[in-house]
Structures are given as structure tokens and as C-alpha cells.
Amino acid sequence: MADSITLEEEKTSKCLPTSIFKGDSLHGKKLQINSLRTCNCKPTNINCMTAKEWMKSQIGVWQFFYEGRDIRDKTIHPATFPISLAKKVIELFTHQGELVLDPFVGSGTTLIAANDLNRNSVGFDLQASYVELCSRRLSENANMFNETQQIAVQEDARNIPEYFDKGSVSLIWTSPPYANLLNRKRKNKSRRNRKNDQLGKIEQYSQDERDLGILELDEYTKTMGDIYEKLLPLLHPKGHCVINVPDMWWENQRITIHVSLIEELRRRGYELRNIIIWDRTNIVNGIGIFGWPSNYITMGVTFEYLLDFWRPPVPETKLKIKDMDEK
């Protein structure tokens, strides 16, 4: 990663649009976007948090609330998360000015959170409609005093490495499509009011053949591994990668998506650092009785996993060999 930004690069970065679509001149091109710290934190610090803020973040169960800017309408996007969740992750693993990458940006919540926190961010999505949604939300949340860049790109996640220098990304954060979890009719068994607008509907991201949300678990896991293996070199050493996933029930069996992803990303070179529980009990309404009295099943809608990985640091022996080669 470069130690400084040239004047020409700074001018170029300020001219970047908030959205890039297939066919645009910048599509498939390396983005000249700033990725360096703009804070005065010590070089060894991993974030700008105070000691008090750090202590609060050590608790391994997190709760969040939605705010007015959040999108909760599933007809707009089938799987959203609060801005406050994205802000927590970004604050914990980046400094001001650094670069955040969301490989499956969806409704653009990551971009809004990064903008609030003076971080640069780029999000990718297959669907032009979601990129348009991101752009609209960014324009509604514009801040004339914020000099960071937020960009949504219509692109397959498999092609993301074309857009960045190696080692330029400080955080990869996303809530990806959840295999074929949403690609089936809703039965609302866990809802007290089952006969609502969601009953019988398929709340899917798309039916694009490249969409991870239509894949069976084994194929989904391998495809996620292929994508994240290509993303790993974009992270600087000790740069974090956080993935929000639930598990699912299918034909009376728990499908442990989070376990599959942990094992797959470990095989691809990532190191698991933490597992955090997102406690959703404060934002879930109308839960009905489920499984009583013969089959105890935890309510999947009440919690999800935040899987925290990082790019392992380069061993000192390798650094010494590299220094000797350069001399």
C-alpha cells in the first residue's frame, strides 16, 4: 500500500461518481480512491476508539436499533441490517480515512455508515436496481463537510480485485446472500400473525444465475470461498473481514451456514478471530410458538452471527528474507 497520495490521485478520487454501472467508463477499472488514515492515532492502534468505547465492544453479544434512515421494507430489499450495526463494525476495525469494502452491498447500508464515520467505502452488487438505490440513499445523506468517497458498483463479486491495489483495504464487511434460504415460499411458522403480506412469498435478491442466493449450501460455500480467496490480497496484513450470517432450518434440520463459512474461509487463508452474536430480540416482533410441545427449536430470527476474520500478519522470518532480497 502506498504511503502517500499524489496530487493527481487526490484530484481523480474527488471526481469519482457515487455509482458505476455496467458500460460506464470506470466499470472494470482500478478506482483511484483514498485508503490512508486521516486521523492522528498511533500507528499500532487498530481503530480510533477510546478505552471506554473499547471495553463496551468486548462484550460478545450485541444489540442494535433501527433508525429513520434504515430500510426495513422487504419489497425494497429482502435482507437488511441497521446502520448502527455497520457503524459498530466499521468503528471497531478501521480508522478515519481508511477504505471499507462491501462485496454484496444491497441497499447500501455499509456506504451510509462509512459516510457517517468519515471512512471511504466501495460496495458491489449484481443488480443495477440496488446500485441505483445506494446512489439515492447517498444523495439523501450527503454531507458537504465530509471529504470521503462512497461508491456503489454494478459488478459480480468475483471481479472485485480489478478495482483495487493489493493491501489497500482495511475492512471487508458484508451481509451476503444466504444460500437459498430466501429462495422458497414463506410459511411464517414462527410468526404469531402468520397471514401477513409475507406469507407464501419468495423474498429473493434476484434469479440471476450468478446470484449466490439461489445456490444450494455446498455450492454456495465453495463460491463464497472462491470470492473471498480473491479478496484476501486486497486486505492489508491484520486487516479484518466480518461476515453477518444466520443459520437456517430445512426439513427439520439445522443448516449451519456459519460453520460452513468458517471452515471454508480458513481453507482459503483467513484466520478466525472472533464470533459475535447479534441479539435481535429487541427488533423482532410478533413471535409465535414454534415446535411445542414435541420439538424444541430456537428461533433463528432472534439471533445471527458476526464472523470476524483477519488476514494473518506476515511472519517476521519472511519479512527478514524480503528485506535481504531488496538489499
Spans of model-derived segments:
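Class I S-adenosyl-L-methionine-dependent methyltransferase catalytic core
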Residues: 1-327
